[in-house]
Amino acid sequence: MRRVILTTGGTGGHIFPALAVAEEITRRYPKARILFLGGQYGPEADLAARAGLEYVGLPVRGVMGRGLRALAAAGAMGLGVWRAVSVVRRFDPDIAVGFGGYAAFAGVLAARLCGRPAAIHEQNAIPGLTNRLLGHVVQRVFLSLPDTTGVFPARRCVPTGNPVRTAIVAAGAAGAAGAAEKGGVSRSAHSRRLLVMGGSLGARAINEAVVAALPALRDAGVELWHQTGVADWERVRAGYKQAGISEARVEAFIDDVASAYTWADLVLCRAGATSVAELAVAGKPSVLVPFPFATHNHQLHNARHVADAGAALVVEQKDVSPGADGRPAVALDRVLVELLADRERLADMGRAARAMGRPQAAAAVVDGMEAILAGRGARGVR
């Protein structure tokens, strides 16, 4: 395997699995060149650069809405495919793999138009439009969840799990070893550490609910590490200051998420497929607030799957947002404080999360890529 294109964009839920696969390719093929093909408008350029990957941005946007906006987005997609074809011809990849999102449509379609083998990875039980379309033109469809197989041609589907970055896998393994030594509890019974994450772009509803809960969290001695997203960073920092909390780590984006998971006793976050996969590999109990406007409400599906396994509590966004009387239906502060105080329950939830983890998912995807290339008499050698 000499050259590989990984293509996706939009949110961390698509991007981070691609970065995990890039790590595994580099581990097996240290001399391989990996090109990350993304969009010009999302966070993928910065994240790829931090991972040390070559990057090309395409002028593509999601096809949303109607009328002129949809027409403009479709035109941009056409231009994106044309440019992606140029990139594929110049880079000459052995294989291209898409991870969903609008950029992946252009990248994978360009690879197939140029006669290159390609695959996609689907993180969710209910695929988005990009992967639904591409699933009929690629050699393999790698699935996080086996029950997604009915959407794609069965002969092309390979259940792999959702790839998680190496540092998180290592942190999860270390946490499991530490918990085993201490009978399932990984740190002091007095620890009250809450990690708040709204996804790679932040989550205003979660940010606002946590700021409202700060007085109770402060009084209960809860330590906080809070990823706010860029848009809400100053507003949330002001909320912490007003609550008299100066020791909390309040960051727009957490670069070292593996350390954040290791630090935390409990995680409050969205229920995107990649977040759920990371929580499982890290063995972390969670309170999940699904994004209610996700396509086909797939985050609620993800959250209930984790909750049914005993690894999470689910609180819907409408229940933590103020109602007509100005009060939320669910007192999030009480939920968090009571759960953080129950060490035995946290340990049980952590074990349940770890049992769901697929730490070898990235390796399974690269195995599948190798199988595609072996079937074509691939040029690259390890």
UniProtKB/Swiss-Prot annotation:
SUPFAM superfamilies: UDP-Glycosyltransferase/glycogen phosphorylase. One of its GO terms (biological process) is lipid glycosylation. Keywords: Cell cycle, Cell division, Cell inner membrane, Cell membrane, Cell shape, Cell wall biogenesis/degradation, Glycosyltransferase, Membrane, Peptidoglycan synthesis, Transferase. Its main location: membrane. Its EC number is 2.4.1.227. The keyword Cell wall biogenesis/degradation applies. It is a peripheral membrane protein. It is found in: Cell inner membrane. Cell wall formation. Catalyzes the transfer of a GlcNAc subunit on undecaprenyl-pyrophosphoryl-MurNAc-pentapeptide (lipid intermediate I) to form undecaprenyl-pyrophosphoryl-MurNAc-(pentapeptide)GlcNAc (lipid intermediate II). Belongs to the glycosyltransferase 28 family. MurG subfamily. This is UDP-N-acetylglucosamine--N-acetylmuramyl-(pentapeptide) pyrophosphoryl-undecaprenol N-acetylglucosamine transferase. The gene is murG.
